[in-house]
Design a protein with these regions (language model features):
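Conserved, structured core segments of small domains
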Residues: 1-99
Length: 99
């Protein structure tokens, strides 16, 4: 399996999507149902500022699998969120890191 990172960039209008509790609950349930999404979370320029995007680290066999995961996420709204996908590897593969 390959490790992938996804960098999401949000427009300011994405804040309304984030504020929708029903959609947020669906997003959290979706993430929990996909253990291949190893880590994920929102990005802010500074702790006291609004979210401007997100970061995911995923293990998947193909870019297509990663894109499917993105496109089916309840938080993905193409008008308000763009993304870039990159392959990713650890410099110290033998070292285990817990966040």
């Amino acid at each position: 399996m390959t490790r992938w990172t996804v960098i999401f960039k949000d427009t300011p209008d994405m804040l309304s999507i984030r504020a929708d509790k029903t959609r947020r609950d669906a997003h959290i349930a979706y993430v929990r149902a996909h253990p291949e999404l190893l880590i994920g979370g929102g990005l802010k320029p500074n702790p006291d500022q609004e979210f401007c995007g997100a970061l995911w680290v995923i293990e998947a066999n193909s870019r297509k699998e990663v894109e499917t995961l993105i496109l089916n996420d309840p938080f993905y709204v193409p008008e308000f969120r763009s993304y870039e996908i990159f392959t990713w590897g650890k410099i110290l593969e033998d070292q285990i890191t817990t966040l």
